Regions:
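Regulatory modules associated with amino-acid/nitrogen control
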Residues: 1-86, 90, 117-130
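Non-transmembrane, interaction-prone segments in cytosolic or luminal domains
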Residues: 7-8, 109-113
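A structural feature that tracks compact, well-ordered secondary-structure segments
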Residues: 76-110
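Acidic/glycine-rich phosphate/pyrophosphate-binding loops and surrounding catalytic core
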Residues: 106, 114, 120
């Protein structure tokens, strides 16, 4: 039986930006807002709220973010799979980023309602800010 998780929809809309491998990281990313930065041997990828997105770079726009609402140990088994299976079955693509103990799912805003329904149907629960 899969994990049943509590999820939260973040308010911001997100952009996934691709920059050259050795590009300088724009200074806006030192300001403390949530963002994800990954430099590889191929590129520099940044996932950020729209208002922080760098200009004049390759981008995918219109993403929303769902996150797990509670911390999970790094060695938890099946957490991501329990989320991805529901979305995959519904035909929804997703990009997953994990921090030390939180999972973030980035999906196209046009699929947000369908994704929410699929995750709820699988037994996951959505919580809201108080």
């Amino acid at each position: 039986m899969g994990h049943k998780l509590k999820l939260r929809l973040l308010d911001d809309k997100f952009v996934i930006s691709k920059m050259p491998q050795f590009a300088e990281l724009p200074s806006v990313f030192a300001k403390g807002e949530m963002c994800f930065v990954m430099r590889t041997d191929e590129d520099l990828t940044i996932i950020s709220p729209e208002f922080m997105a760098p200009n004049n770079v390759q981008q995918e726009i219109g993403f929303r973010c769902l996150r797990t609402d509670s911390e999970m140990p790094m060695n938890s088994v099946g957490i991501v799979d329990s989320l991805i299976q529901s979305l995959s079955t519904a035909g929804i693509g997703v990009s997953v980023v994990s921090t030390y103990n939180i999972v973030y799912l980035f999906l196209s805003e046009e699929h947000l309602v369908k994704a929410t329904q699929a995750l709820q149907h699988a037994g996951h629960e959505f919580v809201h800010e108080e």
